[in-house]
């Protein structure tokens, strides 16, 4: 844990993975091998824990859940139990970011937490045209019911935490949160080893590839002008760096 103004932060690794060449359409295999040095890209599914000076506990994203995710076990090992979490901020609503919100019977894992999602994201998943992934999203929205809150970009979601537009990865707006001393970014960076030197590299998960490329370039410029470290949902452990 490190000091973070009126909060401290902790990365919780929900799952560890390695990304294959086939996940990067359009990238020359020779360049992929050169940049990776071994044919696979280390990746991670991360959750970030923030604790404010007033004792309120905030999670940013919730990992995979189920057998694929280790978030709950690791949180409990550090003394943080689901019922003690006050707020959950979602970068977006893909399965590896919301799966941990649901128990095996579709119940809400976090019994008290308010869940914050951007208004464009909420509207996208509500319209019933989002395909199979929409089923899981609607289960989450149903399980948390009146505890779901929406926000718009540029707003202060919670005191000291602002939501910034990082449109591109999805057709809605995958985004980032800025705290007093940290930038928390969603899926603009799946594979740091490739996408930092080559922001034009996309994965099969980028629903809007051209938008994702533009968003990455904008984010790199923004991050380069900021003294704050970057925390990434898919950056390799420890998930925070410059």
What are these regions (language model features)?
Residues 179-242:
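Cap/insert and terminal regions of metallo-dependent hydrolase folds
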Residues 109-165, 211-218, 224-227:
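Metallo-beta-lactamase
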Residues 9-77, 175-188:
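Conserved beta-strand hairpin/beta-sheet module of binuclear metal-dependent hydrolase folds
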Residues 22, 101, 126-129, 161, ...:
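Short, well-ordered secondary-structure micro-motifs
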Residues 59-62, 86-94, 116-118, 165-168, ...:
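Active-site neighborhood of phospho(di)ester-bond hydrolases with catalytic His/Asp-centered motifs
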Residues 162-175:
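Active-site glycine- and acidic-residue-rich loops that bind
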Residues 2-8:
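Short, small-residue-biased leader/transition segments that mark boundaries at the very start
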Residues 68-116:
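Active-site metal-binding motif and surrounding structural segment of the metallo-beta-lactamase
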């Amino acid at each position: 844990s490190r000091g973070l103004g009126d909060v401290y932060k902790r990365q919780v690794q929900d799952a560890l993975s390695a990304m294959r060449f086939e996940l990067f359409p359009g990238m020359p295999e020779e360049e992929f091998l050169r940049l990776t040095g071994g044919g696979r890209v280390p990746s991670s599914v991360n959750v970030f824990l923030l604790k404010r000076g007033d004792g309120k506990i905030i999670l940013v994203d919730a990992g995979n859940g189920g057998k694929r995710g280790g978030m709950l076990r690791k949180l409990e090992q550090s003394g943080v139990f689901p019922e003690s979490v006050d707020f959950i901020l979602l970068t977006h609503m893909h399965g590896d970011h919301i799966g941990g919100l649901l128990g095996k019977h579709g119940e809400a894992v976090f019994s008290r937490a308010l869940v914050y999602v951007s208004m464009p994201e909420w509207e996208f998943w509500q319209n019933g045209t989002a395909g199979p992934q929409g089923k899981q999203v609607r289960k989450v929205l149903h399980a948390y019911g009146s505890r779901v809150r929406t926000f718009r970009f540029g707003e202060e979601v919670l005191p000291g935490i602002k939501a910034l537009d990082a449109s591109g990865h999805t057709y809605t707006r995958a985004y980032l949160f800025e705290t007093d001393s940290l930038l928390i970014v969603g899926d603009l960076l799946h594979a740091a080893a490739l996408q930092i030197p080559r922001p034009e590299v996309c994965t099969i998960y980028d629903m809007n590839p051209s938008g994702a490329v533009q968003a990455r370039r904008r984010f790199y410029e923004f991050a380069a002008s900021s003294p704050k470290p970057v925390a990434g949902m898919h950056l390799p452990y420890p998930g925070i760096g410059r």
